[in-house]
Amino acid sequence: MNFNTLLSKLISFKTISMTSNKELMYFIKDYLSKSNINCELLEGSKGQFNLYSRIGPNQDGGILLSGHTDVVPTEGQSWNSNPFKLINKKNRFYGRGTCDMKSFIAVSLDLVSKINISNLKKPIHLIFSYDEEIGCVGIQKIVPFIKKL
């Protein structure tokens, strides 16, 4: 799946703050599994999930790529198109979450699916959380998990 297709799929999930992101997280889990990358889904509240994945060697250190999956509501906003359908106009992407922050998630997923994991000297950690837009609720719930790593 190329970046544009991946981003389009991520934008299509209506992961509005305080609603479930379960379908999106299972999509990401399935996407990573196709590259033989394991991940854990950590259930929070109201059907919302955090996702954690360690890619590469099982050792301390490495780099953490973290992003949130929720978007702010679209009610009361004037959109000229469906905000949950990616529009590409002259290589500019429009859709709810393109800037904050589903493009980052798409880039991260696209890149880790292409790297030669056996060449990594340190791990890459992925953490995708929920409800950042309303107080960083999801990341607060995953901090105790991170401390155990």
Whereabouts are the PLM-identified features?
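Secondary-structure boundary/capping motif
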Residues: S20, G97, I134-G135
